[in-house]
Amino acid sequence: MPADVNLSQKPQVLGPEKQDGSCEASVSFEDVTVDFSREEWQQLDPAQRCLYRDVMLELYSHLFAVGYHIPNPEVIFRMLKEKEPRVEEAEVSHQRCQEREFGLEIPQKEISKKASFQKDMVGEFTRDGSWCSILEELRLDADRTKKDEQNQIQPMSHSAFFNKKTLNTESNCEYKDPGKMIRTRPHLASSQKQPQKCCLFTESLKLNLEVNGQNESNDTEQLDDVVGSGQLFSHSSSDACSKNIHTGETFCKGNQCRKVCGHKQSLKQHQIHTQKKPDGCSECGGSFTQKSHLFAQQRIHSVGNLHECGKCGKAFMPQLKLSVYLTDHTGDIPCICKECGKVFIQRSELLTHQKTHTRKKPYKCHDCGKAFFQMLSLFRHQRTHSREKLYECSECGKGFSQNSTLIIHQKIHTGERQYACSECGKAFTQKSTLSLHQRIHSGQKSYVCIECGQAFIQKAHLIVHQRSHTGEKPYQCHNCGKSFISKSQLDIHHRIHTGEKPYECSDCGKTFTQKSHLNIHQKIHTGERHHVCSECGKAFNQKSILSMHQRIHTGEKPYKCSECGKAFTSKSQFKEHQRIHTGEKPYVCTECGKAFNGRSNFHKHQITHTRERPFVCYKCGKAFVQKSELITHQRTHMGEKPYECLDCGKSFSKKPQLKVHQRIHTGERPYVCSECGKAFNNRSNFNKHQTTHTRDKSYKCSYSVKGFTKQ
């Protein structure tokens, strides 16, 4: 040990540069360290304290690496041992000389004085108020942060620091075979390059193990193997961990149940056999192995402190979460993902979500090009192409590619619906389906189309909608070649070819191809008409029909024919009209082969073959083919004449009668005879007139060419 070191003062660090005159002044450990008072130390959070600890250790390693032979400060000594940095006289006697710890050549007489040296050194640091406060705080902090780490792996008594970068820099210090700085950490990673073996480093660690009274035959043998491979790590006594240095694979096996885990963290969480449960709940007395489990339990007890949303009644624990959720009701949703259109209230959530798009997907499907994060996801996806269905339902024989889908399907047979909506009482077999359903009540639409701004509850609905902008129709019918934007539309279309109508009305037995059509039909029996026109008070069972009806009052006709310019209020009327120009008649009668361009005219014609008249007047018993004819007939019993002429005030029970009457005032005569040129204002008079030209006139006048039907 250098003779000029005064133990009664702060340890002055004299390096070899000072001895050979290459350095101008000495540097003390105090000159390069950061000092805190007790008040300042208490204001640091755990992350800042951890940073302080790492900086102190790194500074000390740099000083030692460039050749400064200094006494190891007490707090650094405790940090190197990875133990709680306490300062007690009982423990000081067990500490070893720091010079021998790092392999320095120390005379035998110096070793005999190591106990008094340590005592004097620690006393000096204890008298320093700031160091004393930090030591106590480090001890408390170590109790909290190192408890789980010590259970997982038991570090060696000392760690050695050799900074390869520092030692290789240009300086007057001469070091042979410099090693790499290695810290004894549980998460020590394997080196990419094989470092050179440092003889000084190896011998110092062997000597350090001997001085500390550890098992020489075991630890020294392990050290030879470690240093020979260029690595340093400590072995845990509680579990056997095998690590492949070159591949980085780690297999940890527990002692109790022999379960094999892929990572130490997984084994640590699995070791519930002998693990202590230090975290206890003050409310119910339950104990937990992890603090996160304790916090989750405490949230259950703090239900009384929840902040409830006044709009929808949803409750939140932190006030911040409630304020963020309230923006969903106000419509303030500024963060939209440009990749998939998903909406977020907070920008931080958007940034986290965007990582899913930028994340590497190495497993790619060769059939469709879709990529996945995991190989297992790719295997599941490939079953959709091969149509492989390994899991079959024992009840109905239906096959599925995944076991989870089979389990969900089997709930249909058992009738199990354990997830019920608190708003309407509707029950579901899956929790995810319930979550989607609850968005109907809350009005939450998280997926927005970036093209038109339309929002959707489910991502699948957004994907189907976006195809309307791109024109993509990936689902094609193999029978007729027609394409659709969604698989559900293709399945419904297939029923036209198969004639399948799986949805049957329980009241009248009528069947339908779609469930939505059945729901609309059932409103006829229940008389349910929720949608009422604000202008005339007429009620409808569908909102779409109400919207078309309101166009009568507004005069809006958005569908205009490009051929003749005629406009229509509904799209179905517009399509039917276009068939007049194209000559298309898709509805063909199977009885007589007659074709029609509209569905309504086709149904009217079919009744002529069946003679079916389902609409019967309850007053006189007269039956009609169409419901509109029955309504018109019933006006004769009630005396109702809703159609009034604005010119003369005359009223009529039928709208065609009003149109014929109005031609009297306008003088319009649209029906002209091609034989004689006579014109008429209604079709019935025109038809009667034409019989005068087509009738047989066998009785002729002998005086003229005029003929008569009767003699």
From Swiss-Prot:
Organism whose genome encodes this protein: Homo sapiens (Human)
Gene field: ZNF175
Protein's UniProt name: Zinc finger protein 175
Entries under Gene3D superfamilies matching the protein: 6.10.140.140, Classic Zinc Finger
Record GO terms (molecular function): DNA-binding transcription activator activity, RNA polymerase II-specific; DNA-binding transcription factor activity; DNA-binding transcription repressor activity, RNA polymerase II-specific; RNA polymerase II transcription regulatory region sequence-specific DNA binding; zinc ion binding
Ranges of biased composition (kind: Polar residues): 1-11
Annotated tissue distribution: Ubiquitous.
Compartment(s) where it occurs, according to its Swiss-Prot or TrEMBL record: Cytoplasm; Nucleus
Domain KRAB per the UniProt entry, residue ranges: 27-98
SMART domains (UniProt xref): KRAB, ZnF_C2H2
Function of the protein: Down-regulates the expression of several chemokine receptors. Interferes with HIV-1 replication by suppressing Tat-induced viral LTR promoter activity.
Induction or repression: By HIV-1 infection.
Keywords noted in UniProt: Antiviral defense, Cytoplasm, DNA-binding, Metal-binding, Nucleus, Repeat, Repressor, Transcription, Transcription regulation, Zinc, Zinc-finger
Chain positions covered by the region annotation Disordered: 1-21
